[in-house]
Amino acid sequence: MSEELMNRKGRVLTGIVVSDKNDKTIVVRVETLVQHPLLKKYVRRRNKFTAHDPQNECGIGDKVKIIEYRPLSRNKRWHLVSILEKAV
């Protein structure tokens, strides 16, 4: 399934799992660095994305890779590709 997902077009993001309470769903926090338009200083921006986790294999604190996918529910538009690091 992950090879099929990686061949799709769409954004690929890396983030940390902050919630895994829902069945087959994880919430991933993604941090990006953006330059402030006026101050020219780099600011850390955080977004939360709801992603599909079909085997319920992720835990809180895991570093994961997610990819854009078709809408699966009202808020779920991302799919888990792989777990890069397991939390201790």
UniProtKB/Swiss-Prot annotation:
Q: Does the keyword RNA-binding feature in the UniProt annotation?
A: yes
Q: How does it assemble?
A: Part of the 30S ribosomal subunit.
Q: Name one GO cellular component term.
A: cytosolic small ribosomal subunit
Note the superkingdom of the native organism: Bacteria
Q: Which UniProt keywords apply?
A: Ribonucleoprotein, Ribosomal protein, RNA-binding, rRNA-binding
User: Briefly, what is this protein's role?
Assistant: One of the primary rRNA binding proteins, it binds specifically to the 5'-end of 16S ribosomal RNA.
Q: Which gene encodes it?
A: rpsQ
Kindly list the GO molecular function terms attached to this UniProt entry: rRNA binding; structural constituent of ribosome
- Name used for this protein in its record: Small ribosomal subunit protein uS17
PROSITE patterns attached to this UniProt entry: RIBOSOMAL_S17
Annotated source species = Nitratidesulfovibrio vulgaris (strain DSM 19637 / Miyazaki F) (Desulfovibrio vulgaris)
Protein family membership: Belongs to the universal ribosomal protein uS17 family.
One GO process term, biological-process aspect: translation
Pfam families on file = Ribosomal_S17
